[in-house]
Amino acid sequence: MALPGLKRILLKLSGEALMGPSPFGIDPETVASMAAEVKEAKDRGLEICLVIGGGNIFRGMAGAAKGMDRAQADYMGMLATVMNALAMQNALEQLGVQTRVQSAIEMDKVCEPVIRRRAERHMEKGRVVIFAAGVGAPYFTTDSGAALRAAEMKCDALLKGTSVDGVYNADPKQDANAVRYDRLSYDRVLADNLKVMDASAVALCRDNHIPIVVFNIREPGNLARVLAGEGVSTVVGDGAV
């Protein structure tokens, strides 16, 4: 499905996307491959910012389920996203792409604080900006952080790279008869509790008219194909079914 007129996008990656074949942590070859995808998209003339989850290192909700204090566990998850952001920054800069990391939890020895106008200037100058540490507060997912940054940066679309090629009516890994949707409305996603992003993230995108594009980031070259309208994806937006 074509995505015309895009100038600025936010790409949301799960932390698990950086694991590659490993069961945990960061696989340098996989990060380098993801960075090449981002560079290819940037070379199309797009302004790009990223949000990366932290589930490959630590997931706050999983920690809370095992008895940890939820807020404490979420802060640990936020720190994991900073580690992933620094890994991606390194990979992008090795490809010659100037990159800045901005963290919602200030740590000025390793990255900038989140400053909206500074982030906008970075992108206008052709730099990639990676937003880390979610929204800087517990009880919010990195999906919510991605929706917030997409709204702040006035992005034309939020692209969510996952391990599947769109949104289905059932888990395609468990149900061979699962059907993929080409387009969905925000309200349909919320009403049917479809697993696109958490409800607060979808609502924030709806209120700011930011389309959500769900696609498979693990397929080489797929980000560029989706941006060209040639790849397989699901678009969540206004006026869809």
From Swiss-Prot:
<dbReference type="GO" id="GO:0005524">
    <property type="term" value="F:ATP binding"/>
</dbReference>
<protein>
    <recommendedName>
        <fullName>Uridylate kinase</fullName>
        <ecNumber>2.7.4.22</ecNumber>
    </recommendedName>
</protein>
<dbReference type="GO" id="GO:0044210">
    <property type="term" value="P:'de novo' CTP biosynthetic process"/>
</dbReference>
<comment type="subunit">
    <text>Homohexamer.</text>
</comment>
<keyword id="KW-0547">Nucleotide-binding</keyword>
<dbReference type="InterPro" id="IPR036393">
    <property type="entry name" value="AceGlu_kinase-like_sf"/>
</dbReference>
<keyword id="KW-0963">Cytoplasm</keyword>
<comment type="similarity">
    <text>Belongs to the UMP kinase family.</text>
</comment>
<keyword id="KW-0418">Kinase</keyword>
<feature type="binding site">
    <location>
        <position position="162"/>
    </location>
    <ligand>
        <name>ATP</name>
    </ligand>
</feature>
<dbReference type="GO" id="GO:0006225">
    <property type="term" value="P:UDP biosynthetic process"/>
</dbReference>
<comment type="function">
    <text>Catalyzes the reversible phosphorylation of UMP to UDP.</text>
</comment>
<dbReference type="InterPro" id="IPR011817">
    <property type="entry name" value="Uridylate_kinase"/>
</dbReference>
<feature type="binding site">
    <location>
        <position position="54"/>
    </location>
    <ligand>
        <name>UMP</name>
    </ligand>
</feature>
<dbReference type="InterPro" id="IPR015963">
    <property type="entry name" value="Uridylate_kinase_bac"/>
</dbReference>
<dbReference type="GO" id="GO:0033862">
    <property type="term" value="F:UMP kinase activity"/>
</dbReference>
<keyword id="KW-0808">Transferase</keyword>
<feature type="binding site">
    <location>
        <begin position="135"/>
        <end position="142"/>
    </location>
    <ligand>
        <name>UMP</name>
    </ligand>
</feature>
<keyword id="KW-0665">Pyrimidine biosynthesis</keyword>
<feature type="binding site">
    <location>
        <position position="55"/>
    </location>
    <ligand>
        <name>ATP</name>
    </ligand>
</feature>
<feature type="binding site">
    <location>
        <position position="59"/>
    </location>
    <ligand>
        <name>ATP</name>
    </ligand>
</feature>
<feature type="binding site">
    <location>
        <position position="171"/>
    </location>
    <ligand>
        <name>ATP</name>
    </ligand>
</feature>
<feature type="binding site">
    <location>
        <begin position="12"/>
        <end position="15"/>
    </location>
    <ligand>
        <name>ATP</name>
    </ligand>
</feature>
<comment type="pathway">
    <text>Pyrimidine metabolism; CTP biosynthesis via de novo pathway; UDP from UMP (UMPK route): step 1/1.</text>
</comment>
<dbReference type="GO" id="GO:0005737">
    <property type="term" value="C:cytoplasm"/>
</dbReference>
<feature type="binding site">
    <location>
        <position position="168"/>
    </location>
    <ligand>
        <name>ATP</name>
    </ligand>
</feature>
<feature type="binding site">
    <location>
        <position position="74"/>
    </location>
    <ligand>
        <name>UMP</name>
    </ligand>
</feature>
<dbReference type="InterPro" id="IPR001048">
    <property type="entry name" value="Asp/Glu/Uridylate_kinase"/>
</dbReference>
<dbReference type="Pfam" id="PF00696">
    <property type="entry name" value="AA_kinase"/>
</dbReference>
<keyword id="KW-0067">ATP-binding</keyword>
